[in-house]
């Protein structure tokens, strides 16, 4: 199923019983977080708060609160079908010419999808039906959530931040939280390795003292939203990838303030600039780790215009101790990662990011081991392959006889196949998430790899244990008798 815009997606969710409308007054200050948190933990529906206290603009929450809704948003019928999205990304990351007529025919569906990649620019768009400028630019008129009691201020959480670097023709879409500090100002919290921060750094180096154009789109169509959180190859824009997911070109429109282009169907758009040397101390906020983070200085985004659709919807979320919406996104996107990794490392049989690991901090990998030391090669490969895994602190590697999505099997492999000295790899002074207060220095810490594979000659001098297995004929005999037994 493909969706033209967010409203089309919500209409389809409502038909499936996956959207709940709340027509009683609910406050964006803490109450919406508590409701969405309970809904998510029950695998409940998305929720549209139609009467947010003190506001007339409804608030959409828990939109991607189940992996199934993430899959639907990406145009797939099931979570398992997201493997096909991963295969498409793997092909686009390292395309191969057809090996013959049959191979060319097999690749024809992909080539047809590629035709939907270039976005289509419109002269006018729904997202610009209403325009606030000058004194009318006032973020307090939007029902922006305050998520946790210790949060310093209200926080924009689901904005798609649009940037462009001086060396790139394509634009970058990223999701960075934004603390409201004035009617027309927010703090743009982007980490140094993220696309928006890299674009901004490059711009400042070439254009010192110049204001940097930025736009933030709220309530885009699901393909565009999810494109911003998917490991899209650097050569591909999120708008192009959204077109592939949707099966139709992404419609964009030029901002009224500068030349950046935003999703034409977005519900609300913030347009403006980051002015030179304007920074502010951000936080503390409750985060996906389950803790309040430290304060840190980031650039200030000054909003010159706010444009929106008629009767707009404000899309929001919260982050907290898993499970939260980012953790659910991680569960779904895990299926996208598997084919990407398998194309680069054919020995990998499965890859799992447990949601309890705060989306990406712990990864478990199963593999077909081929030589001594192979597990360590896989560890280093994962840490360096995708930007998303640069901050993964722990990697556990097992043989392919272990179901890595079953913690009982993983723990069994660790406790029976690991010697702590021989099989623990420690790498010091590596990039670490700034939110990770466990690291001794902000942004710099260590990583651990655990080799829970069976050991080969050269890795041990002892005879290795053999796994106990019942005789196959006996199992077949008991299968036949089972219905006759009184169990």
Swiss-Prot record:
Location(s) in or outside the cell: Cell membrane
InterPro entries: UbiD, UbiD-like_C, UbiD-like_N, UbiD_bacteria, UbiD_Rift_dom
Ligand binding (prenylated FMN): 175-177, 189-191, 194-195
MF-aspect GO terms: 3-octaprenyl-4-hydroxybenzoate carboxy-lyase activity; metal ion binding
NCBIfam families: PRK10922.1, UbiD family decarboxylase
Oligomer status and interactors: Homohexamer.
Protein purpose: Catalyzes the decarboxylation of 3-octaprenyl-4-hydroxy benzoate to 2-octaprenylphenol, an intermediate step in ubiquinone biosynthesis.
Family: Belongs to the UbiD family.
Stated name of the protein: 3-octaprenyl-4-hydroxybenzoate carboxy-lyase
Gene source species: Nitrosomonas eutropha (strain DSM 101675 / C91 / Nm57)
């Amino acid at each position: 199923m493909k969706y033209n815009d967010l409203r089309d997606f919500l209409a389809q969710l409502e038909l499936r019983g996956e959207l709940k409308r709340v027509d009683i007054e609910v406050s964006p200050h803490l109450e919406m977080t508590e409701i969405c948190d309970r809904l998510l933990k029950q695998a409940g529906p998305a929720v549209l708060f139609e009467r947010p206290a003190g506001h007339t603009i409804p608030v959409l929450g828990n939109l991607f609160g189940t992996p199934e809704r993430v899959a639907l948003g990406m145009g797939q019928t099931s979570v398992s079908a997201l493997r096909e999205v991963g295969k498409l990304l793997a092909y686009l990351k390292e395309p191969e010419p057809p090996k013959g007529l049959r191979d060319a025919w097999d690749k024809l569906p992909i080539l047809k999808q590629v035709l939907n990649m270039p976005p289509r620019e419109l002269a006018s768009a729904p997202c610009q039906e209403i325009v606030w400028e000058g004194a009318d630019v006032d973020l307090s008129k939007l029902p922006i959530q305050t998520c946790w009691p210790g949060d310093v201020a209200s926080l924009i959480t689901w904005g798609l931040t649009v940037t462009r670097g001086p060396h790139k023709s394509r634009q970058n879409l990223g999701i960075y939280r934004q603390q409201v500090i004035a009617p027309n100002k927010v703090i743009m919290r982007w980490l140094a390795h993220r696309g928006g921060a890299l674009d901004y750094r490059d711009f400042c180096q070439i254009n010192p003292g110049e204001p940097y154009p930025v736009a933030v789109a709220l309530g885009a169509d699901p393909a565009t939203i999810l494109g911003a959180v998917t490991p899209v190859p650097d050569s591909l824009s999120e708008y192009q990838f959204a077109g592939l997911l949707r099966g139709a070109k992404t419609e964009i429109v030029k901002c009224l303030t500068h030349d950046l282009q935003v999703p034409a169907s977005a519900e609300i758009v913030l347009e403006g600039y980051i002015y030179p040397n304007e920074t502010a101390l951000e936080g503390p906020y409750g985060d996906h780790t389950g803790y309040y983070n430290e304060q840190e200085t980031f650039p200030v985004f000054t909003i010159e215009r706010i444009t929106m659709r008629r009767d707009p919807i404000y899309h929001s979320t919260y982050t907290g101790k898993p499970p939260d919406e980012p953790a659910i996104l991680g569960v779904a996107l895990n299926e996208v990662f598997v084919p990407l990794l398998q194309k680069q490392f054919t020995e990998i049989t499965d890859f799992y990011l447990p949601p309890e690991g705060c989306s990406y901090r712990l990864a478990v990998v199963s593999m077909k081991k081929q030589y001594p030391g192979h597990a360590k090669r896989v560890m280093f490969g994962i840490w360096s392959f995708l930007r998303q895994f640069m901050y993964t602190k722990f990697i556990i590697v097992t043989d392919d006889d272990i179901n890595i999505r079953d913690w009982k099997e993983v723990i069994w492999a660790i406790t029976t196949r690991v010697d702590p000295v021989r099989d623990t790899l420690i790498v010091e002074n590596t990039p670490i998430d700034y939110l990770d207060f466990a690291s001794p220095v902000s942004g710099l810490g260590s990583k651990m790899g655990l080799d829970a594979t069976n050991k080969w000659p050269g890795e041990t001098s002892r005879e290795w244990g053999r796994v106990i297995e019942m005789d196959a004929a006996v199992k077949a005999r008991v299968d036949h008798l089972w219905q006759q037994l009184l169990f």
